[in-house]
Regions:
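Nucleotide-activated sugar donor-binding and catalytic core shared by glycosyltransferases
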Residues: 1-234
């Protein structure tokens, strides 16, 4: 999905002739967004957009030590300061620790009338909502993939996405209230929004699905299986 990931696979011993860089598959989803009106989207998802809006998705961390209740509390308590911002919050995934996130997510929505919990927006409505919103906060891969491709800012909190390729529209921070709030102010700033428009995502690609299909179709599976050798870097 990126040139850097292609390089890493070759470093692991794969022959360069067998490794292809095509871009991330989400490029196709973005290019296939159907025309929509803001009013219709609001009706479809049951959410009234404000002047400023953000999408929130927090998943459990699977690396970097214990994903503590304290971190979750800090995250949602900081977001509670955004009184005049429309917040669309989606469910965490099913990794261990998701129930604790859900507990605080529901509490967060109950105490703040600018928050709308949507279990799953679906691919099309998610991308449409992101096009309207100012950006994303949390630790979803969408903050590294879809958000930069749509020229939107994202705040990547914690270690879940550590080690993945990123770009200038992504603000990395840990579970620290002051740092998160500082990042939030930045993501809504005119200067940062303008900078995001100039960012080139490392995941960019065209006709990704078709390229993958053509590559797979051109390969002889039995030959690939028999000719597998370790490639030494020169």
């Amino acid at each position: 999905s990126t040139k850097n990931y292609k390089k890493r696979l070759i470093q692991l011993g794969e022959s360069p002739s067998r490794v292809y860089h095509v871009g991330a598959i989400c490029n196709d989803n973005i290019n296939n967004i159907k025309k929509f009106s803001k009013k219709r989207l609001e009706k479809d998802i049951g959410f009234k957009f404000k002047k400023r809006n953000i999408i929130v998705t927090l998943h459990p961390e699977t690396t970097g030590g214990q994903f503590t209740e304290k971190k979750i509390k800090i995250f949602f308590k900081t977001l509670s300061k955004l009184k005049n911002v429309g917040i669309i919050a989606t469910y965490p995934n099913i990794d261990a620790g998701n129930q604790l996130i859900l507990k605080y997510l529901e509490k967060f929505a109950k105490e703040n009338n600018n928050v709308k919990i949507i279990k799953s927006l679906g691919a099309q409505n998610y991308l449409k909502s992101l096009k309207i919103c100012d950006g994303i906060i949390g630790n979803s891969s969408s903050g590294l993939l879809e958000s930069p491709l749509l020229k939107k800012g994202s705040i990547n909190v914690g270690l879940r996405q550590k080690g993945r390729d990123t770009c200038g529209s992504v603000i990395d921070t840990d579970f620290d209230s002051k740092k998160i709030y500082k990042a939030l102010k930045k993501i809504f700033s005119k200067k940062f929004k303008n900078n995001c428009k100039k960012v080139k995502s490392p995941y960019i690609g065209k006709n990704v699905s078709h390229k993958i299909y053509k590559i797979i179709k051109s390969q002889k599976v039995q030959k690939l299986r028999n000719d597998k050798v370790f490639y030494d870097l020169r």
